[in-house]
Design a protein with these regions (language model features):
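Surface-exposed extracellular loop regions of Gram-negative outer-membrane beta-barrel proteins
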Residues: 1-30, 38-44, 48, 53-99, 119-139, 163-174, 219, ...
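Residue-level signature of outer-membrane beta-barrel architecture
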Residues: 4-6, 47-51, 63, 106, ...
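Repeated loop/turn-to-beta-strand initiation elements of outer-membrane beta-barrel proteins
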Residues: 9-12, 54-57, 110-113, 162-166, ...
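Transmembrane beta-strands of outer-membrane beta-barrel pores
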Residues: 18-24, 61-67, 106-108, 119-123, ...
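Conserved C-terminal beta-signal and adjacent last beta-strands/turns
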Residues: 45, 189-312
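Outer membrane beta-barrel strand-and-loop segments of large Gram-negative receptors
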Residues: 89, 93, 99, 108, ...
């Protein structure tokens, strides 16, 4: 990794990472024994340009490799319900993605705006696919030809009055997946938007009331398309004893509108699934901080090299 500054406004970082992997597949049941070697080269480049005070442009280009997980590789079948089974695919290949991000941020006092446009192309995309076998639905995983996702992230935070903060976030993108496996079409495409708005009220000292609304338009997955869904959560938090003790309450899906509705119409089968999870829940929380230690301004912190960590 190398980084430098050009003039007073532009800084950049560039890097190159190479990775050699060896995968050994040994199955006595299927009489298979083979070893594959893969070399992956991952360059990266990022830069930040200070347009003016509070205005900033950023650019990032990167590559990554995503390897299949154990459930995706496990070739033995497991039952999900009376008619649906799942099995992995031990011949899955890693997926390789290239991503380009272009961002803009504006910060002026209580007003903060962030925009990010992105394009992400993935080859050998690891995709879930469902087929019919003897009146059973068999779900497995395959490598689709490609997956393309491009869109815009938008985040806005404002503080109109001292006792209220408002945050608005939205992610709008176009996705297109293409591929075919043993006669089954796994292609799908469409435009999706995921948005949420948060109102944070501070009515009195130590009190915090939050109201958040989520909206998701239809999502497009290989073989599957979901319907629009939305829900609202409301929460309250109160701090006591100079912040050492906190009591909180949260009610999710206030109007009980969250649902999971999926449809699939392909050359193998037609499927419509409508289900509703236990999305409306009432949570109570209580916490107390016994250690209110505050580090002095001139006290040195431990470096990563001198700090011994236990666990993750």
């Amino acid at each position: 990794m190398f980084g430098s500054r050009i003039g007073k406004k532009f800084t950049y970082k560039a890097g190159l990472r190479g990775e050699m992997s060896r995968v050994t597949l040994d199955s006595r049941h299927d009489n298979i024994s083979q070893t594959d070697y893969t070399f992956f080269l991952a360059p990266s480049l990022s830069g930040i340009y200070d347009i003016a005070d509070g205005h900033e442009l950023s650019l990032a280009v990167s590559r990554r490799i995503g390897r299949p997980t154990y459930p995706q590789l496990n070739p033995y079948m497991s039952m999900i319900d009376a008619t649906t089974y799942e099995k992995g695919n031990m011949h899955l290949q890693p997926e390789k993605a290239t991503k380009l991000d272009l961002g803009y941020s504006l910060s002026r006092g209580s007003f903060n705006l962030f925009l990010n446009g992105y394009v992400n192309h993935t080859s050998d995309y690891i995709s879930q696919i469902t087929a019919i076998d003897s009146q059973r639905l068999i779900t497995t995983y395959v490598n689709a030809a490609s997956d393309l996702k491009s869109g815009v992230d938008f985040t806005l935070r404002v503080n109109p009055v001292k006792w209220m903060n408002v945050s608005l976030a939205a992610n709008t993108y176009y996705v297109s997946t293409s591929g075919e496996y043993e006669g089954a079409e796994i292609s799908n495409k469409g435009v999706t938007n995921n948005s949420n708005v948060l109102f944070d009220f501070l009515p009195w000292k130590g009190g915090d009331i939050q109201c958040q609304y989520f909206v998701s338009t239809p999502q497009y997955f290989p073989q599957l398309t979901t319907s629009l869904t939305h829900q609202m959560n409301v929460g309250f938090k109160q701090r006591f004893l100079k912040g050492a003790m906190t009591a909180s309450i949260l009610l999710t899906d206030v109007f009980k509108t969250a649902k999971w509705e999926v449809s699939s119409h392909n050359n193998i089968f037609d499927l419509t699934n409508i289900s509703r999870n236990k999305s409306r829940m009432l949570w109570f929380g209580f916490s107390y901080n016994f250690n209110s230690f505050k580090q002095k301004a001139d006290q040195k912190t431990e470096s990563d090299r001198s700090l011994i960590r236990l666990g993750l």
